[in-house]
Curated annotation (Swiss-Prot):
Mode of membrane association: Multi-pass membrane protein
Region (Disordered): 989-1009
Places the protein is found: Postsynaptic cell membrane
Catalytic activity reported: Ca(2+)(in) = Ca(2+)(out); Na(+)(in) = Na(+)(out)
Function of the protein: Member of the ionotropic glutamate receptor family, which plays a crucial role in synaptic organization and signal transduction in the central nervous system. Although it shares structural features with ionotropic glutamate receptors, does not bind glutamate as a primary ligand. Promotes synaptogenesis and mediates the D-Serine-dependent long term depression signals and AMPA receptor endocytosis of cerebellar parallel fiber-Purkinje cell (PF-PC) synapses through the NRX1B-CBLN1-GRID2 triad complex.
Biological process (GO), any one: modulation of chemical synaptic transmission
Protein's UniProt keywords contain Transmembrane helix: yes
SUPFAM superfamilies (UniProt xref): Periplasmic binding protein-like I, Periplasmic binding protein-like II
Protein name (record): Glutamate receptor ionotropic, delta-2
Disulfide bonds: none
Gene Ontology cellular component terms for the protein in this record: AMPA glutamate receptor complex; dendritic spine; plasma membrane; postsynaptic density membrane
Transmembrane segments: 567-587, 636-656, 831-851
């Protein structure tokens, strides 16, 4: 069945090609085609044959044609052939040539009044460029432009805007007229786009080989980055060869996104381009709407078109070029025009015109024929063919095809949108079924371990590592929704990445730049420097700079009570107590006070010290001081003690109720102002680059960052900076160091610190964010960003955050000291020193008491001789009695022992008065201590003694063997001591009849009377 049309076509072709113009034929059409467009001639003759077989249009009339082939870039040849056709007599001229030759034919047609239907043809199938102004449609011109104006600039600009491209390269082949995209370049320049141009030589292999031979490695890497986004103004054949070459030489990767724009892209070309390309491919081509009724697709204007041309599934129809379609519709339009002219009986016969003959007149029927053609319109292979007042065809439609995402080269192609001059872009270039198309796609993810974003959850020998963290949870949420899978690995150098001196990038960013990974995931911040080499999704968490510091340690200081004063001050106070005590003693010794009868002076050095100490601690003194010098001294001392004690009390309250913060840093400004506490960050990180840029850039220099940069960059950055964040956190915890890093990371560290010894300080200004990095031009960026926004809108992102940053943390993240249970209560540690001093005093007192008891018992075990005891006790008695005789004002009284009567003494009461015993030393430089007693009865006895009896004492039967003598001096304690001139003789003991007194074993008594 398919053989017959082909045979019929060949028979018709040969018969028309060699058939001369019939003398009785009134319809003659001339045609001039480019010599390389043999297919135009084939379709032209096929259209004439179809119309000659259709009796409904021209009835009995037949169309005859004359075809000439010319060089498309030779205007003189085109004019010469056109004149030859006009000399034969033609009703219309059809041409399918380039703009250069068309301009000459336009002038000739205007001069000869021959309707000229021009079908612009681009050389070698390259995209069309607008013809020069002299070749464009004018209202009074005889040239009609069958093909619509060139709208490629408008279409490609809207596509690029839809893709939000900011940087790309345009490739064009040698046959393309670069002047055709002048308007497009102007539009991109106004939008601030960075567009590069590169001409593709005819020998593509040699061109690529030359680039590899002449470019350095760094230049090739940059060139690969440029190729991620490209627009190709090429013929389908050149585009196939170019794509094949760059893919085989590994100049492009699966993240590339290319746009091929050309009206002349057939269905077969689309399939071949998709098969050869990788990444995402977008194709823009002209399309022709088909009737929705499939049975009417080959019936147009009462004319049945050849099935091989109108059936989209027919291979011959798929191979049709756009110029072929317009040529067929042009013949159909002329046939309908001739039909109307015949019906209106306004037919003008053909005339033989001479272009060379001088004074040749134009065709008289040309104007009428032109108006009839312009008013007509047909629906053919190009949908609707008609002309406006300017003589151009306004009907044009474009379709935008796009490949699915993924690495499978056998993926399909779908229509993403359409475009026309009236409605513009109709549709979206985003594949709505992307989530289904990503199923089966395996992404290679590079990461850097950073708590809590990415952590190793399980590491079993021989099995792949398992990761967890906030960023991993976000990636899993995307994978579950979009259907892709991923393989994850850690960056070899464990760095986020920065640009090196040679222009290359290291770390995680370097893995993306060198195409070793598809996605970069961690606590990765979005910075302008990184955005210049990689693409980022929208931020999934805000970012701010923070500082990690160690809280002030609440150490147990048992002697915190001594903290208000410095050790040197305490030493001065102790020395002052000793000095003042000594001065008080000396002042009293030099000018002793006058004591009343019966008083005992206690102004010893020990008592003076005790008095000064007691007054210092506000406990008062026991010994009265009456001299003016001593009182003056004590008054000044009390004033001194008042000031010292008041100052101590106030400072002690401050020390015990207010925690002294060693590190009072509450903001980045506080950190920058101080220099005592060193601080730093991670080398080659975003924080490092941020501090450096704001601290050194003269256009955005910040004083705070300038101070921080001086500290961070000390000794070239090696002193205060670390290689990874874990090292910085460790330095803070176990040393004097402040770590400047991402606030989110530091908050997680402070929350999970076992002893809650860390706190954070941040600026709370989220000028940046965390995002997922992808290769430049990655097709996954937009859909990832869209899904992240959905997670944020429905609250799922907040749930993931609470998993790693809980609100009910046991640690206070922002307090520089440990929290207390009560704001006013003081703990035992604040007063431990006081209790220790008290305990030490108790122990020391017990020890002294033990020593005293031991010493007393040891002293009592040494029993003295009776002679010594008798002599000393009796002598003491004399002294004590003399001290009671206050009637006589003489300081030196002489007594006679015979005048003293001891009989009235109640000796039974003497043992009860043992508490009145007193240790006195009345004998200087003798080292003899006498033990005596002053019973209450002796005071009564002293009152009965007369001043006259002071000359001597009657002791009854006691014989006085003592040689009397005067006492020359009074002892300081109020008693007497022996004169250094007279030496008292011993008084022998004589028994006196009296009751027996039993003192028991009294160790304090040496003599019994």
């Amino acid at each position: 069945m398919k053989v017959f049309p082909a045979v019929l076509f060949l028979i018709t072709f040969w018969s028309l090609e060699w058939e001369p113009v019939l003398p009785d034929s009134i319809i003659h059409i001339g045609a001039i085609f480019d010599e390389s467009a043999k297919k135009d001639d084939e379709v032209f003759r096929m259209a004439v044959a179809d119309l000659n077989l259709n009796n409904e249009i021209l009835e009995t009339e037949k169309i005859t044609v004359s075809v000439e082939f010319v060089d498309g870039n030779n205007p003189f040849q085109a004019v010469q052939e056109a004149c030859e056709l006009m000399n034969r007599g033609i009703l219309a001229l059809v041409s399918s040539i380039g703009c250069m030759s068309a301009g000459s034919l336009q002038s000739l047609a205007d001069a000869m009044h021959i309707p000229h239907l021009f079908i612009q043809r681009a050389p070698a199938g390259t995209p069309r460029s607008s013809c020069p102004p002299t070749t464009r449609a004018q209202p009074d011109d005889y040239t009609l432009f069958v093909r619509p104006p060139v709208y490629l600039n408008d279409v490609i600009f809207q596509v690029v805007m839809e893709y939000t491209w900011q940087k790309f390269i345009i490739f064009y082949d040698t046959d393309y007229d670069i002047r055709g995209i002048e308007n497009f370049l102007d539009q991109t320049s106004q939008q601030g786009m960075d567009v590069s141009l590169q001409k593709v030589e005819s020998n593509i292999n040699m061109m690529i080989t030359g680039m590899f031979r002449t470019m350095r490695v760094e230049e090739l890497h940059r060139y690969r980055d440029t190729l991620r986004r490209a627009v190709l103004f090429m013929s389908p054949a050149t585009a196939k060869a170019f794509i094949t070459e760059v893919v085989e030489t590994n100049l492009v990767a699966f993240d590339c996104q290319w746009i091929i724009i050309n009206e002349e892209i057939s269905d077969m070309d689309v399939q071949e381009l998709v098969m050869k390309s990788i990444g995402r491919l977008t194709l823009v081509r002209q399309t022709f709407p088909l009737p929705q009724n499939t049975s009417q697709r080959c019936v147009r204007n009462n004319h049945r078109i050849n099935t091989s041309l109108c059936d989209p599934k027919d291979p011959k129809a798929q191979m049709l070029e756009i110029t072929n379609r317009y040529i067929y519709d042009t013949v159909l339009l002329l046939a309908n025009t001739f039909h109307r002219k015949l019906e209106d009986r306004k037919w003008h016969s053909m005339a033989s015109l001479s272009c060379i003959r001088k004074g040749s007149k134009p065709w008289q029927g040309g104007k009428s024929m032109l108006e009839t053609v312009k008013k007509g319109g047909v629906s053919g292979l190009t949908s609707l063919l008609e002309f406006n007042d300017n003589g151009s065809n306004p009907n044009i439609h474009f379709e935008i095809l796009g490949t699915n995402y993924g690495e499978d080269r056998g993926r399909g192609v779908s229509r993403l949108a359409t475009w026309d001059p009236i409605h513009g872009l109709n549709g979206t270039l985003t594949d709505r079924k992307l989530e289904n198309n990503m199923r089966g796609v395996v992404l290679r993810v590079v990461t850097v371990l950073e708590e809590p974003f990415v952590m190793v959850s399980e590491n079993v020998l021989g099995k792949p590592k398992k990761y967890q963290g906030f960023s991993i949870d976000v990636l899993d949420a995307l994978a579950n929704y979009l259907g892709f899978k991923y393989e994850i690995y850690v960056a070899p150098d464990h760095k986020y990445g920065s640009q090196q001196a040679d222009g290359t990038w290291n770390g995680l960013i370097g893995e993306l730049v060198f195409k070793r990974a598809d996605v970069g995931l961690s606590a990765l911040t979005i910075t302008p420097e990184r955005e210049s080499v990689v693409d980022f999704t929208t931020r999934y968490m805000d970012y701010s700079v923070g500082v990690l510091l160690r809280k002030a340690e609440r150490t147990v200081d048992m002697f915190a009570c001594l903290a208000p004063f410095d050790l040197s001050l305490w030493a001065c106070i102790a020395g002052t107590v000793l000095l003042v005590g000594t001065l008080v003693y000396l002042l009293n010794w030099l000018n002793p006070p006058r004591l009343p009868m019966g008083s005992v002076s206690s102004t010893t050095l020990y008592n003076s010290m005790w008095f000064v100490y007691g007054s210092f601690v506000q406990q008062g003194g026991e010994v009265p001081y009456t001299t003016l010098a001593t009182r003056m001294m004590m008054g000044v001392w009390w004033l001194f003690a008042l000031i010292v004690i008041s100052s101590y009390t106030a400072n002690l309250a401050a020390f015990l109720t207010i925690s002294r913060i060693e590190n009072s840093i509450q903001s980045l400004q506080d950190l920058a102002k101080q220099t005592d506490l060193p601080y730093g960050t991670v080398l080659d990180s975003a924080v490092y680059d941020q501090v450096r840029s704001k601290g050194m850039n003269p256009f955005e220099r910040d004083p705070m960052y300038s101070q921080m940069w001086r500290m961070i960059n000390r000794t070239g950055g090696a002193e205060n900076n670390v290689e990874e964040s874990k090292e910085g956190i460790r330095k803070v915890k176990y040393g004097r160091f402040a770590f400047v890093w991402d606030a989110a990371v530091l908050e997680y560290v402070a929350i999970n610190d076992e002893d809650c010894s860390l706190y954070t300080v941040s600026n709370n200004v989220a000028d940046r964010g965390y995002g997922m990095a992808m290769q430049h031009g990655s097709p996954y960026r937009d859909i990832f960003s869209q899904r992240i926004l959905e997670l944020q809108q429905n609250g799922d992102m907040d749930i993931l955050k609470l998993k790693w940053w809980p609100r009910d943390s046991p640690c206070d993240l922002y307090s520089p000291v440990g929290t207390r249970k009560s704001g006013s209560a003081l703990d035992i540690h604040s007063f431990a020193g006081v209790f220790f001093v008290l305990a030490a005093g108790v122990v020391l007192s017990c020890l002294i008491a033990t020593v005293e008891t031991w010493w007393t018992r040891r002293k009592g075990s040494r029993v003295p001789s009776k002679e010594d005891d008798k002599e000393i006790d009796l002598e003491h008695l004399h002294h004590r009695v003399n001290s009671l005789c206050t009637e006589d004002e003489s300081p030196h009284k002489q007594f006679s022992t015979s005048s003293i009567d001891l009989t009235p003494l109640d000796m039974d009461s003497l043992p009860a008065a043992r508490q009145a015993l007193e240790q006195i030393s009345d004998f200087r430089n003798t080292h003899i201590t006498t033990t005596t007693f002053i019973p209450e009865q002796i005071q009564t006895l002293s009152r009965s003694l007369s001043a006259k009896a002071a000359a001597g004492f009657a002791f009854g039967a006691v014989q006085d063997h003592r040689t009397g003598g005067p006492f020359r001096q009074r002892a300081p304690n109020g008693g007497f001591f022996r004169s250094p001139v007279k030496t008292m003789s011993s008084i022998p003991y004589q028994p006196t009849p009296a009751p027996n007194f039993s003192y028991g074993n009294d160790p304090d008594r040496g003599t019994s009377i």
